[in-house]
Each structure stands twice: as structure tokens, then as C-alpha cells.
Amino acid sequence: MSLKQWMGGLFAGLVWAVGAQAAGFETRPATPAPELKAQDLAGATKTLADYRGKVVLLNFWASWCPPCLREMPSMERLRDKMAGRPLVIVALDSAETRAEVDAFLAKMTLGFPILLDPDGSNTKRWKVFALPTTFLLDASGRIRYVLTGPTEWDEGEALAKVEALLAELPAQPPQ
């Protein structure tokens, strides 16, 4: 591949990424989510069924992706803001080794589950073509919103989407 072809591809990718980011959230008509099966950092296999009954923010990311890393602190703030509510944030690392993920986590402490997708099989199954891509699932495990590109999860439209999905759940008794 020539430098000109490579630069052309890079430019096209950037134009697509900016357009995707500017497009905001894609609303889905309660689409059933594809299968998700991945190991967490402790080696336990997790599936979407493990999170049934909760709103799920499923974020596909990689440690080499600057926009992914920029939005991670806002996901942590959202987790703190929603403590005690039926929301789970899951970050699925796409196509990296455990060593690469561990090196990243040595620099940034995160309190939400990190799942590993070293062969990229979940990324392909979910048709993720750019990082970060985030799916908001309702408590029944259906995709309701998709966002390609980074956002501040603890404010604005992103927070409103999470709150709207939480509002659909039956009221929880005080704890």
C-alpha cells in the first residue's frame, strides 16, 4: 500500500469517525442483544444473563484508543453517581492481550467490571467497527441506544438516556 493510499484511508476514517460522533445516540427499537461471553479479570466467564434486571452500559474500548481513555473517567463518575441503583457499567476490551489491559489498569483504577475479548469475537458479533462504541441495554437485555465515539457519561444527553432506562424499572424498596 502506498503512502497516498494509506493517508487517503486515514482521512476517510477520520471523516467517518467525526460524522459518527456528531450523529449522537442511535435509538434502537428494543433490539435483542447478540450473545456476549467473555472473561473478567478474575477469570470468571460472564454473559449478559449475569446482568439481567439491570440497565447495562456496555462499552467496547481498547487501551490504544485515546477517545476511549478520555471517556473512562466519566464512566467511573457515572458509576459513583448511580451507586445503589440497578445500573452496571461493563467495559469490554477489544482484541488486546491480558498484559496490555493490565498495563493500562496499572495507570488508571476503574471500579466497574472489565471483560476481555482477546480474539475480538464479541466485537465482531456486536458489529463494532470503531472504538469506543457503547450500547445501552434495558433491564431485559435489549439494545435501546448505541453511541459510536466518546462522550461524558455523567452529564447531558448520555446521563439522560441512562436515567430514562432506569425510570422504566419498577420502583425499588428503600435499602
Where are these regions (language model features)?
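Bacterial N-terminal signal peptides
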Residues: G8-V18
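N-terminal "domain-start" segment that seeds a small globular fold
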Residues: A22-L48
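Short pre-active-site segment immediately N-terminal to redox-active cysteine/selenocysteine motifs
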Residues: K54-V56, F60-W64, A130
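Hydrophobic beta-strand core positions in alpha/beta domains
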Residues: L57-N59, I89-A91, F135-L136
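Conserved redox-active cysteine motifs that mediate thiol-disulfide chemistry
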Residues: F60-R77
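Thiol-based oxidoreductase modules, predominantly thioredoxin-like and allied folds used
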Residues: P86-R98, F112-D119
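Thiol/disulfide oxidoreductase modules built on the thioredoxin-like
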Residues: A103-G111, D117-E163
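Non-globular targeting/processing and membrane-anchoring segments
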Residues: L169-Q175
